[in-house]
Amino acid sequence: MTLNIKNHPCFNDSSRHTYGRIHLPVAPKCNIQCNYCNRKFDCMNENRPGITSKVLSPRQALYYLDNALKLSPNISVVGIAGPGDPFANPEETMETLRLVREKYPEMLLCVATNGLDMLPYIEELAELQVSHVTLTINAIDPEIGQEIYAWVRYQKKMYRDRQAAELLLENQLAALQKLKRYGVTAKVNSIIIPGVNDQHVIEVARQVASMGADILNALPYYNTTETVFENIPEPDPMMVRKIQEEAGKLLPQMKHCARCRADAVGIIGEINSDEMMAKLAEAALMPKNPDEHRPYIAVASLEGVLINQHLGEADRFLVYALDEEKKSCTLVDSRQAPPPGGGKLRWEALAAKLSDCRAVLVNSAGDSPQSVLKASGIDVMSIEGVIEEAVYGVFTGQNLKHLMKSSQIHACKTSCGGDGNGCD
């Protein structure tokens, strides 16, 4: 099928009042720390870039898209733009794109990325007819780049300072070249940060134009509290306009960017409707695969009051259900755990025993069982606290960070800047 790429409202100014877009928030982890970015993304009341109220699994995202299209049939584009980086979450990103392409062959697909980890996926992106990719390139001089990025995490190794900026730039430019070889429309975002790169954005424009970039979005930096750059003011409109005019001599400019949330939906510039956000929240409460019937949550507990047992040490799991009025949860079963030993087979047996559970709440768990259970559609959540509070919170989509153990939060990948260590 030939896609009508003119209907992309972010790349075509004439389409933005007619066609809408939807960002599916399936990518919470990030592989770099920008000095202007606050990784606390779970917020309903802010509208800064990267914010989302929920994070979805790929199949939850498809369920949400189905409902969103009923409310806004003018949506022409499905994008993945965070709240982290799509290719720091490659499995979730690629599965989501595959699911959407299969069900909605006429839909435009796009991703927005920093480009660090994108290279291995470009060929499949082209096969899936991902027509538009946005790369954020804030500097082509590593001396400037090292002022913008606190760290870069690539192939499980940490990089800082100039080395980090050089690695990021190398991968960004290689990704841009490969995207153009595969015929993908490439937009480059370059964030104007006063006193840091405002005198350099034109050089970025010149470089990416020479490599075939289709459009540049020179957009003003968004001042965000609790960041390294929190004391840097946003650029004034005159500075932005001058940079856009000068860059416009090199390649076309996008001038209608709304610096969208990672869960933005509808016409650019319009606030997400309450009805649409209710559909997003509904999707987040579904099992990871909404087509499956998983009405329960399992818990590892020594005495039946607290979540205080390691997954591998539990000899039985308590199983809870949400009551019909959704005001409390009830213990409905107790299931024996498979005997110790057996490696992966043990965890596959546990997954079978808990096949009607959407999550298992434990004090801690190893990587191997987490991987097996996740592949079976069961979330493993490391939590400390009272069973009823935690189980009810998971069922109803509450923020449980106050109960989560630090190993579950993964500071350097998801909800805060961290220092980039301890991610795995």
From Swiss-Prot:
Domain Radical SAM core: 12-261
GO molecular function annotation: 4 iron, 4 sulfur cluster binding; lyase activity; metal ion binding
UniProt KW keywords: 4Fe-4S, Iron, Iron-sulfur, Lyase, Metal-binding, Nitrogen fixation, S-adenosyl-L-methionine
Domain of life (superkingdom): Bacteria
Annotated cofactor note: Binds 3 [4Fe-4S] clusters per monomer. One cluster is coordinated with 3 cysteines and an exchangeable S-adenosyl-L-methionine. The two others probably act as substrate.
Amino acids binding [4Fe-4S] cluster 2: C257, C260
Enzyme class: lyase
GO biological process, one term: nitrogen fixation
E.C. number: 4.-.-.-
CDD domains the record matches: NifB (cd00852), Radical_SAM (cd01335)
SMART domains given in the database record: Elp3
Pfam families listed in its UniProt record: Nitro_FeMo-Co, Radical_SAM
Protein's job: Involved in the biosynthesis of the iron-molybdenum cofactor (FeMo-co or M-cluster) found in the dinitrogenase enzyme of the nitrogenase complex in nitrogen-fixing microorganisms. NifB catalyzes the crucial step of radical SAM-dependent carbide insertion that occurs concomitant with the insertion of a 9th sulfur and the rearrangement/coupling of two [4Fe-4S] clusters into a [8Fe-9S-C] cluster, the precursor to the M-cluster.
PANTHER family on file: FEMO COFACTOR BIOSYNTHESIS PROTEIN NIFB, FEMO COFACTOR BIOSYNTHESIS PROTEIN NIFB-RELATED
Name of the protein this chain belongs to: FeMo cofactor biosynthesis protein NifB
Gene source species: Chlorobaculum tepidum (strain ATCC 49652 / DSM 12025 / NBRC 103806 / TLS)
Gene expressing this chain: nifB
